[in-house]
Amino acid sequence: MGNLRILISLTTNDNDYQVEQANAAEQAAQKHGIDLKIIYSDNDAINQSTQILKVIQEVEEADRPNAIIFEPVGGTALPQVARAAVNQGIAWVVLNREATYVPELRGLGKAPVFIVTVDHIEIGRIQAEQCAALLPRGGAVLYMQGPSENSAAKDRAKGMLEKKPANLHLINLKGQWTEESAQRAVRSWLKLTTTRKTVIDLVAAQDDAMAIGIRKAFQEVPNEVERERWLS
């Protein structure tokens, strides 16, 4: 019997969290003698679906993985792709996302199917409590969310809105979990006429990379007085 073959599909290779997941997987694979392949979908749900299906549909069984572990890019956890994998006897693991089809696919009894995730709503609540502690008298929070179609981003925003006090006002921007995407979003926001009179008391982001991107965008402001106003 040969080594287990595992395919991991991650969203992007320019996000610290995704890179750390890849590093952890490589270390575990080396430790346990697993043949590991990692692919990235460049934050494109169609690309991710196509990449995984191509592997599932390999003619030779030896070219197919024994298991697929993936973090979904889009709003769904690729139910049709999941079914195709399980029908081929390939184990299916969803990272950081709920997937309502899991009980049904488990019932087929053809391959293991499960989810590894965290409580994203609770993460949003905790962040709301942190913001409230930092701004006990209230204020304006520049809040950088993940992609609109991403359920983790939606759940974190839901938790934030549930728990934040009424005296905290959120100014919402959208990113793609990366420094560059957050930087672009803030650059565009700073160009708006309405932004000139805006006062920000706190910056909050749904991941560390986007928080860094926000700061970098403020550091680019050419006017020293304005730059210090945003950074102070």
What are these regions (language model features)?
Residues 1-232:
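A residue-level marker of the well-folded mature domains of exported/periplasmic proteins
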